[in-house]
Curated annotation (Swiss-Prot):
This is Protein GrpE. One of its GO terms (cellular component) is cytosol. Gene3D superfamilies: 3.90.20.20, Head domain of nucleotide exchange factor GrpE. The lineage of its organism: Bacteria, Pseudomonadati, Pseudomonadota, Gammaproteobacteria, Enterobacterales. One of its GO terms (molecular function) is protein-folding chaperone binding. Transmembrane segments: none annotated. SUPFAM superfamilies: Coiled-coil domain of nucleotide exchange factor GrpE, Head domain of nucleotide exchange factor GrpE.
């Protein structure tokens, strides 16, 4: 038998087997190449995704730090502004008893006595000068009557029946109150009107 005539156990010539195997390989190869992804491409895609995520985190971090710095700057400016505005608070609190003493001296002074008129005038001028000076620095006196009771600036000491003043309004001032740049440094002690029973 010649080599062409040799048959394989299945009854096929060796050339036919080679051809069949070659066709099977060709048929399998396109499927394998479609399924087979280059691991480098996958790694590149993964690294690009990680890079994009890192850049986003970095951008967010920078924005957050900028926002925190801006907030810190604003808070610092407000703190400095408050420190300037209210730096005199302790000093003004020390002056209030002096102003109260001058007020009481005027209340008890015998203004009808001609011998005391010079002293009364001196006390009035001293009190006026002192109040003018503290007003320049933002201090205001709380001494109005017949205004609604405001717990932010008034401290009610007593309630008194009154026909002249509406109920709930300030009837009288026992001790003047003071504000410094709108902040109450001492509430006015007041009597409050109530309706007659």
């Amino acid at each position: 038998m010649s080599s062409k005539e040799q048959k394989t156990p299945e009854g096929q010539a060796p050339e036919e087997i080679i051809m069949d195997q070659h066709e099977e390989i060709e048929a399998v190869e396109p499927e394998a190449s479609a399924e087979q992804v280059d691991p480098r491409d996958e790694k590149i895609a993964n690294l690009e995704a990680q890079l994009a995520e890192a850049q986003t985190r970095e951008r967010d971090g920078i924005l957050r730090v900028k926002a925190e710095m801006e907030n810190l700057r604003r808070r610092t400016e407000l703190d400095i502004e408050k420190a300037h505005k209210f730096a005199l608070e302790k000093f003004i609190n020390e002056l209030l008893p002096v102003i109260d003493s001058l007020d009481r001296a005027l209340e008890v002074a015998d203004k009808a006595n001609p011998d005391m008129s010079a002293m009364v005038e001196g006390i009035e001028l001293t009190l006026k000068s002192m109040l003018d000076v503290v007003r320049k620095f933002g201090v205001e006196v709380i001494a109005e009557t017949n205004v609604p009771l405001d717990p932010n600036v008034h401290q009610a000491i007593a309630m008194v029946e009154s026909d002249d003043v509406a109920p709930g309004n300030v009837l009288g001032i026992m001790q003047k109150g003071y504000t410094l740049n709108g902040r109450t440094i001492r509430a006015a002690m007041v009597t409050v009107a109530k309706a007659k029973a």
